[in-house]
Amino acid sequence: MLKRLESLLAQADMALTSAQKEKLLGYVALLHKWNKAYNLTSVRSPEQMLVRHIMDSIVVNPHLRGDRFIDVGTGPGLPGIPLAIVRPDAHFTLLDSLGKRICFLRQVQHELGLDNITAVQSRVESFAPPAGFDGVISRAFASLGDMLTWCAALPRKEEGRFYALKGQLSEEELNALPAGFRVESVIGLQVPCLEGERHIVVLAAN
């Protein structure tokens, strides 16, 4: 698995430390183990997890600005856990409403020694952080409009940004934003060995 991960990283022109690679593989091992009982992801094989969960998450890293992020609807920690591993100087709040997912995330935190994540069990509409985040990240929402509607109160005023991880994008979706928001950029992502389009949409309040 290490050689496979190193091959994928080389294709993406990404350099990680041995400790970071070890933690990414440790996360995949835990996800594979827990998935058998808790059904955390539809991806069953560790090899596919490397592509569809690890690489699909960490290719986002160069486009993030700031050091305080929240991953909304994180599920089993995606993209938050892989990002926290490759961005150790930043802090990630992982928000999800299901207890079994939060239990898994806390086990991951304990076993991998990740001190830059906080797992929070809450619905997004009930979550009131003490301060706004530099970035609100999610790949859980069906539409950009839904993400902005539910997460409007989470970013820092003016400097905060929304980072939506999407597959195919339509002009219709980009043009159907709630009032008061704008698209700053749409960035195509290259994920090694993953077919289909991947984008990160960066949004901000007007």
UniProtKB/Swiss-Prot annotation:
Q: Where in the cell is it found?
A: Cytoplasm
What Gene Ontology molecular function terms does this protein carry? rRNA (guanine-N7-)-methyltransferase activity
Q: Which InterPro entries match?
A: rRNA_ssu_MeTfrase_G (IPR003682), SAM-dependent_MTases_sf (IPR029063)
Q: Which residues bind S-adenosyl-L-methionine?
A: G73, L78, V124, E125, R139
Where does the protein principally reside? cytoplasm
| Keywords of the record | Cytoplasm, Methyltransferase, rRNA processing, S-adenosyl-L-methionine, Transferase
One Pfam family from the UniProt entry? GidB
Q: What is its EC number?
A: 2.1.1.170
Keyword Cytoplasm tagged: yes
Tell me, what does this protein do in biology?
Answer: Specifically methylates the N7 position of guanine in position 527 of 16S rRNA.
Q: What is this protein called?
A: Ribosomal RNA small subunit methyltransferase G
Q: Which gene encodes it?
A: rsmG
